[in-house]
Curated annotation (Swiss-Prot):
It comes from the Bacteria. It is an enzyme of class 2 (transferase). InterPro entries: QueA, QueA_dom1, QueA_dom2, QueA_sf. Pathway: tRNA modification; tRNA-queuosine biosynthesis. Belongs to the QueA family. One of its GO terms (molecular function) is S-adenosylmethionine:tRNA ribosyltransferase-isomerase activity. It comes from Rhodopseudomonas palustris (strain ATCC BAA-98 / CGA009). The gene is queA. This is S-adenosylmethionine:tRNA ribosyltransferase-isomerase. Monomer. Its EC number is 2.4.99.17. It catalyses: 7-aminomethyl-7-carbaguanosine(34) in tRNA + S-adenosyl-L-methionine = epoxyqueuosine(34) in tRNA + adenine + L-methionine + 2 H(+).
Length: 360
């Protein structure tokens, strides 16, 4: 399909720079096949689901993946900014760096800011290799959990580019950019649909007979990238690591067999569930990378309902929701959202989408 079909104009005032408080007070646009759009709030979610439905949340935790440092040991010491995007092993990370032209294989970058170092000493990394578009492979001086601790001490919250271009990250983002489910470190971006949940909402859902299950997909920086190819068939999807336990898979399969719906909280949960689904719709245990790319024409096997935020033009995520509900339906829904002041992107409002081949 032509990528331009998924483009739209978004006024800057519709981009949220901070979340609402409390989290479940965010607006939520309900999109059902063949029904009028409904303007609700996230707190209404229990009334929109049914006993036996099963929510699936992503429990990945965002790391302090934004690092600032200087190249050392080769004359001038230019400032280097790095965003960690994918862990390769205990000491090696793939990263996006600026300015990449200042680095060569073999160079050493010392990370920290304002003279700050981690408790274990300087956090140094050697450039092992350079790729295209600012990508480098960094080999750090620490390994495993020790490296994780060092990154947490000198790094900063990696805000999405559409927020970072407007303001710097601050202490509030440390809390705001984690979901209440965040427990497994490894993401460089938040699974943002989960940001809307509160303990009170979780309790209300349980009281209505709605189950809740955790899976893990470590969200990568590629989630923010627009599709530059003119045709979707030419786009190369980024890979992300995910896990679904055997117990969770069995519970979801049993609930669905009993008539319950699978409600994915976020596109990351949906992509992982669909990656683990068999042709008959049953979900298998999963522990692997997935680079699933969902566009209109895809046959959904595992997910019946999707709760998700509002996404970027020409993004793989807008393509995904268009596959889920139909392109015409989502174009109309987004036009309504823009016209009525819904807040877009990571800190923005939510939508609740019912699959276009299922009657809710």
């Amino acid at each position: 399909m032509r990528t331009e079909l998924f483009d739209f104009d978004l006024p800057a005032e519709n981009i949220a720079l901070r979340p609402v408080s409390p989290r479940d007070a965010a607006r939520m646009l309900v999109v059902r096949p063949g029904a009028p759009l409904e303007d609700r709030i996230v707190r209404d979610l229990p009334a929109l689901l049914a006993p036996g439905d099963q929510l699936v949340v992503n429990d990945t935790r965002v790391i302090a993946a934004q690092l600032t440092g200087r190249r050392i040991g080769r004359g001038l010491e230019p400032k280097i900014e790095a965003t960690l995007i994918k862990r390769l092993d205990g000491a090696r990370w793939q990263a996006l760096v600026k300015p990449a032209k200042k680095l060569l294989p073999g160079d050493v970058v010392r990370f920290g800011h304002d003279g700050r170092v981690c408790l274990l000493g300087h956090l140094d990394a050697t450039v092992e290799a350079k790729g295209d578009a600012g990508e480098v492979t960094l080999v750090f001086s620490f390994h495993g959990p020790v490296l994780d601790q060092a990154i947490a001490e000198v790094g900063a919250t990696p805000l999405p580019p559409y927020i970072a271009s407007k303001r710097a990250p601050d202490a509030q983002d440390i809390a705001d950019y984690q979901t209440m489910f965040a427990s497994n470190e490894g993401a460089v971006a938040a699974p943002t649909a989960g940001l809307h949940f509160t303990a009170e909402l979780e309790t209300a859902l349980a009281a209505c007979g709605v189950g809740l299950h955790r899976i893990t997909l470590h969200v990568g920086a590629g989630t923010f990238l627009p599709v530059k190819a003119e045709d979707t068939s030419e786009h190369r999807m980024h890979a992300e690591w995910g896990t679904i336990s055997s117990g969770t898979a069995e519970a979801l399969n049993a609930a669905r067999a009993a008539g319950g719906r699978i409600v994915a909280v976020g596109t990351t949960s949906l992509r992982l569930l669909e990656s683990a689904a068999r042709d008959d719709g049953r979900i298998a245990p999963f522990a692997d990378e997935t680079s699933i790319f969902i566009t209109p024409g895809y046959r959904f096997r595992a997910v019946d309902v999707l709760m998700t935020n509002f996404h970027l033009p020409r993004s793989t995520l807008f393509m995904l929701v268009s596959a889920f509900c139909g392109l015409d339906t989502m174009q109309a829904a987004y036009a309504h959202a823009i016209r009525t002041g819904y807040r877009f992107y990571s800190y923005g409002d939510a939508s609740l989408l019912f699959r276009n081949d299922i009657t809710p």
